[in-house]
């Protein structure tokens, strides 16, 4: 089992933003966290990657893989850096914490990431010169450093135009063939196109948790779960 969460709660001030969250996600699943804005999706993801703590110790109620890649909704890119320079910086940072690599291996890792996410033609540019779609590819490449077992993507297609949207969705589908992916979205079509399973969250509670193959009408299911 890639992810196991048991009875997780989170308060922010007096607001109970996550209520008794329980879920199990298997290896190789692509799971969509679907819900309206403010439902608790991003909060759950931040707890999973260790940015925030749950009310009780996360060690007792979250069992996660050792390696996790994370793409936050507001992707912090250093726009003055070149694409290769940016990725090399994060390879140095990440690999220092995980294991030692020689300069040659680090360079090879950067080139593999660039090729994997389709950045070859843009790799010589500064990050700030890239379109929104290519910036998301840079963010995905950063999240994949170290070949993580689990990839957590918070609203990965926000702000993309229709062509960029389809490109990033196709890329995430490809990435999801050999690892577990959890992505958050409020777009139903996104879940239909990319996910094998949907978890609908509203007001901090899981309302629906089903394989997509068991859902005949996602729109109706979503409406009924979020009334």
Task: Identify the function of each model-found stretch.
Residues 34-36:
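The feature captures the beta-strand-to-loop junction immediately N-terminal to the Walker
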Residues 49:
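Helix-to-loop junction immediately C-terminal to a conserved catalytic motif
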Residues 3-5, 18:
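Conserved structural motif at the start of ABC-family nucleotide-binding domains
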Residues 88, 92-95, 99-122:
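Conserved ABC ATPase "signature" region
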Residues 165-177:
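Helical segment within the ABC ATPase nucleotide-binding domain
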Residues 151-155:
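Catalytic Walker B motif of ABC-type/P-loop ATPase nucleotide-binding domains
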């Amino acid at each position: 089992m890639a992810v196991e969460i048991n009875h997780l709660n989170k308060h922010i001030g007096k607001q109970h933003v996550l209520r008794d969250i329980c879920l199990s996600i298997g290896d190789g699943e692509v799971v969509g966290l679907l819900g309206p804005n403010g439902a608790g999706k991003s909060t759950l993801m931040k707890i999973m990657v260790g940015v925030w703590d749950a009310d009780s110790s996360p060690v007792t109620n979250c069992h996660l893989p050792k390696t996790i890649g994370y793409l936050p909704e507001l992707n912090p890119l250093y726009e003055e850096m070149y694409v290769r320079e940016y990725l090399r910086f994060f390879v140095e940072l990440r690999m220092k914490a995980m294991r030692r690599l020689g300069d040659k291996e680090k360079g090879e890792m950067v080139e593999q990431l660039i090729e994997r996410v389709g950045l070859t033609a843009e790799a010589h540019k500064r990050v700030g010169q890239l379109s929104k779609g290519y910036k998301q590819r840079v963010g995905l490449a950063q999240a994949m450093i170290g070949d993580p077992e689990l990839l957590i993507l918070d609203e990965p297609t926000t702000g993309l135009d229709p062509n960029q949207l389809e490109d990033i969705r196709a890329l995430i589908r490809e990435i999801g063939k050999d690892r577990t992916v959890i992505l958050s979205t409020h777009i139903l079509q996104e879940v239909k196109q990319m996910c094998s399973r949907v978890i609908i969250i509203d007001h901090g509670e899981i309302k629906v948790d089903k394989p997509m193959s068991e859902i005949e009408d996602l729109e109706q299911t979503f409406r009924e779960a979020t009334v």
